[in-house]
Amino acid sequence: MVMHDLQEISGYCRASGAHEAGAQDEFWNRVRANIGSFDLREDERLCAIALVKRMFPVVVREALGWEIDTTRWPSTVYIAAVRWIRDVLAKNPSSAERYAKSVHHSVGSSAFTEQSTSFPDIDTGACAGFATLEPNYFHSSFILNSREVALADRQRRELIRELRSLHQAKLDSNTSVGPAPSYYALLLADGDSVGTLVRKYTGDVVAERLAVFASEVPGTVKRHDGVTIYSGGDDVLAMLPVETALKCAEELAEKYREAFSDIPNATLSVSLVFAQIRVPLTAVIEEAHRLLDKDAKESNGRNSLAVAVRNRGGFTCKWVTTWTRKLAGTDTESSSVDLVHGMAKKLSGSSLTSGASTSLVYRLRELISMLTGKSAWSPGDRITLLEELDGVRFIKAEVIRALADDQQDSVDSEELTDLVWNLLQAAPNRKLDSDEPRLARVTIDGLLLARFLATGGREEDR
């Protein structure tokens, strides 16, 4: 019933016997025939409030004369998969068409419900409407769920077989289609100390520059295959695919600085949550706000990026950093986003196999915990490391060990060690807790984030 303490509206009571139960089913089947099975599942019987909320976008024009663009917002599942969809359409259209036809044969036209206009470059009519498929049909876990998809066992097996055939199809000579990504990114941005700027430079001056920034946001997000949910003044809320989210965040910070080019110390902080598509959106939004306010701004001193990876079981990493950081032992500044993407490329299989890259990251986590005497690690931990321990030497030993296990001769161990060490450094905009010069702070979360990015946000789709 969705709202457990309110009565569903058919007027029939299933507990009164088979006749009442049958009449109730018939009532809801007639409702479902008019609105579609994706707006009302087979097992749903709604109360009046829930039905109004569910149907409001559909009937609001007729009832109130309002215009609501219900096609504007793609689902989080579609956002996660949009670049994958584009790749399949461009590089293996025959496989895309075959799968779309298989879904239509098994499920019918009710499976083709995606109407978002956010990606006009994607031809929704191509390949039997592949891009208009309800994007859950790109995931076997959805098809296997009998509550979500009412199919006979034989039809379910056939559809799973067709989906796996799509996964095994080729994008090019070296790359298979693979499963659709199961993660998307929620981005939240906010200007730092705007009130202070207003008091110093007046509201009109600041408002003029905020308007310049806000005008740049939709185009910036769109270039990264994202969707802007809200942009006003210094606030931004957007959804993006995993591959492009970090670079979009970095570009937004640059656009903010450009808009305030004549005002020093005007900076932007951003939080990003890479969320598994089944995690409730409300929980993702709450975490994005907490990351932005508590981690990027309060703990790290603003002008910062805070990133978390959230699967169905909880958080697997929380990485907080300044936008740029000094490379160890030099005065050279490097983009923190470029560093983590560079590490992800090393771990993606182009340099190391999946097993070796995973082994390296988790060995380093265990090594650092052992060196610091920390028995348990939690996402976001910044660990105190004595400089006398010569962390670089220990890390290089683990890198060489991982390369040897992988029988990998083409990777420069010195380069990989430098990349790892630079990514391990905590990068705050304010002093850490201790002023003791013999102490350094490291965090393993940057490496864990790189390992996640190397997967492209994909999970093994069984």
Regions of interest found by a model, annotated:
Residues 1-462:
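Regulatory and interdomain segments flanking nucleotide-handling catalytic cores
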